[in-house]
Amino acid sequence: PDFDYAAASEADRLQRLAAWVGHIDLIEISDGALDDEAREALAVFRRMAKLQAEVGDEVFGTYVISMTHSASHVMEVLLLARLVGLCGHNGRDWFCRIQVAPLFETVDDLQRSEAILDQLLSNKVYRALVAANGNHQEVMLGYSDSCKDGGILASNWNLYQAQLSIIAL
């Protein structure tokens, strides 16, 4: 309640999100406290959790995070997953029943992709969730937006550079 998320720095956002995602007890969120967009996003995650409970973990594939501009964008998705019990810490072990993949689409995002992934993988909570999900991190690199953004040559070069740096991680 006393944390101004919109005004916070990226480092502070990431730290706070990690604390919320890593909290042992589920955080209760009243739908009445949310705006329409947040309520709709949480409803999607509730549906995902319900489907997993009814059908099994394999009911849906990777959750792609379009236009990932920062590490906090990925952790925000994991917070939604945590709110419905798809990931977190149960007091003994970490669990993660959702695979998330950042999608880097613009030239700027492609250039920042290594730093963003390094931030995520250096975060203890995120790293624990990746480990609980089989130590597998999927990453997507977009072509069309980076091409619109910087042209064909810049797009291809930045895609190539992003691939090299991500593989090195």
Which residues does each PLM region occupy?
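Extended, charge-enriched "interface" segments that sit outside catalytic cores
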Residues: 1-54
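Glycine- and acidic
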Residues: 25-36, 56-67, 95-106, 142-154
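Ligand/cofactor-recognition surfaces for anionic moieties
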Residues: 34, 47-50, 59, 159, ...
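Phosphate/oxyanion-binding active-site loops and adjacent basic polyanion-contact surfaces
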Residues: 36-44, 65-76, 112-113, 158-159
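Secondary-structure-rich domain cores
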Residues: 46, 53-61, 72-98
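Active-site capping/gating regions of soluble enzymes
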Residues: 76-89, 101, 105-169
